[in-house]
Amino acid sequence: MSVSCCCRNLGKTIKKAIPSHHLHLRSLGGSLYRRRIQSSSMETDLKSTFLNVYSVLKSDLLHDPSFEFTNESRLWVDRMLDYNVRGGKLNRGLSVVDSFKLLKQGNDLTEQEVFLSCALGWCIEWLQAYFLVLDDIMDNSVTRRGQPCWFRVPQVGMVAINDGILLRNHIHRILKKHFRDKPYYVDLVDLFNEVELQTACGQMIDLITTFEGEKDLAKYSLSIHRRIVQYKTAYYSFYLPVACALLMAGENLENHIDVKNVLVDMGIYFQVQDDYLDCFADPETLGKIGTDIEDFKCSWLVVKALERCSEEQTKILYENYGKPDPSNVAKVKDLYKELDLEGVFMEYESKSYEKLTGAIEGHQSKAIQAVLKSFLAKIYKRQK
C-alpha cells in the first residue's frame, strides 16, 4: 500500500470519528499556545488521530510480506503490541506531532503530514516499548503502567526478550515503508540508530554500577548520574521527538545543537523528577512500584543523600541501600525524610524551571521557543 493510499484510508477513518474542522491540526503560538495547554478537546482529537495511525501501522506489521504469519503468531504479536506499545501515556509520540505543528507556524498540516508525523511519533513509542520490555527484565521489575511487566504475564516469560527484538525491528519496517522516498530518510535512519546506541550505552553504564558483590556507593556522584541520564533517557525522550519534527520541516540537525542542549537539560530534570517519584509518589498514581533503592540505582536521591549525610547517616545508607528486604528499604526512606530530600527536590525543581525558561526565551526562533515551552509545560510539577 502506498503512502498516499494509507493517507486516504486514514482520512476516511478520521472523518468518521472527528468533525471535519478538526482534520487540520493547526500550529499554535503565543496566546494560542497557552490555549492549547488549557484545551482538552484539541488534545483528545489529536490523540484519537494518533491512535488511528497506530491501527494502520499495526495492520501493516501484522501483514508484513517478509514473514509468513500463522494465526497463532499474528495473534501473539497483535496482543504484544497492544500491551506494550499502545498502553503508555504516549507523550513522546504525540510530541512529534505537537512539535511539527508548532514549527509550521500557523500553516495547516496536510493529511499526509498528519499521518507521517504520527507515524514518526509511533516509531518513538515502539522504541520506548522495546527499551522498557528489556529494562523490566534486567531490573526484575514487577509492574509497569499499572499492570504486570510483560515478562511476568503468564506464558510470556523470557519470550519477552525476543518480543523486544521484534519491537526494535518494527521501527525500521515503518520507516522504510513510509519514509524511504523522503529526502530526509537517511537522516531519520541515522537518527534512530544513533539514539538507540546512546540509550543502550546509558543503560550499560547504569547496569554495570550494580553488579552483585561490587556495590560501592562511593562511586556515585552527580556527574555519574548526569552521564547515565543524558544517554539513557534524555536523547530518546526529549531530543528525538523534536529532531524528528525538525527533519520533517526540512531542517538540518547540525544547525540546532543549542536546541539539543536545552532538551538534554530538560531530560535530566525529567529523570530527577522520576527518581524523586520512584521513592515518594503513590504507586497507584505512578503506575509502577519503585525499586531504585532495592536495585542499588544511581538515583539523584542517593547522590544528594551522600552529599548531606553525617558519618552516622552515611553508615545507615551503606548498610541498607541496595537490599530488597522491606525493612532495609524503609530505613533508607526514613533517612531521606530526615535529610529533607523532598525539600531539596522542590528547590532543585524551581531552579531548573527558571534556568530552562531563561534558555528557551533566549532562542531567536519563536517557533522553536514554542516547541521547547510545550515540552516544559508537559513535565513541570508532574505527578507521574
Curated annotation (Swiss-Prot):
Required cofactor names: Mg(2+)
Pathway: Isoprenoid biosynthesis; farnesyl diphosphate biosynthesis; farnesyl diphosphate from geranyl diphosphate and isopentenyl diphosphate: step 1/1; Isoprenoid biosynthesis; geranyl diphosphate biosynthesis; geranyl diphosphate from dimethylallyl diphosphate and isopentenyl diphosphate: step 1/1
Organism lineage: Eukaryota, Viridiplantae, Streptophyta, Embryophyta, Tracheophyta
GO cellular component, one term: plastid
Top-level taxon in the UniProt lineage: Eukaryota
Keywords, comma-separated and alphabetical: Cholesterol biosynthesis, Cholesterol metabolism, Cytoplasm, Isoprene biosynthesis, Lipid biosynthesis, Lipid metabolism, Magnesium, Metal-binding, Mitochondrion, Steroid biosynthesis, Steroid metabolism, Sterol biosynthesis, Sterol metabolism, Transferase, Transit peptide
SUPFAM superfamilies noted in UniProt: Terpenoid synthases (SSF48576)
UniProt organism field: Arabidopsis thaliana (Mouse-ear cress)
Tissue/organ expression: The FPS1L mRNA accumulates preferentially in inflorescences, whereas the FPS1S mRNA is predominantly expressed in roots and inflorescences.
Name of protein: Farnesyl pyrophosphate synthase 1, mitochondrial
Family: Belongs to the FPP/GGPP synthase family.
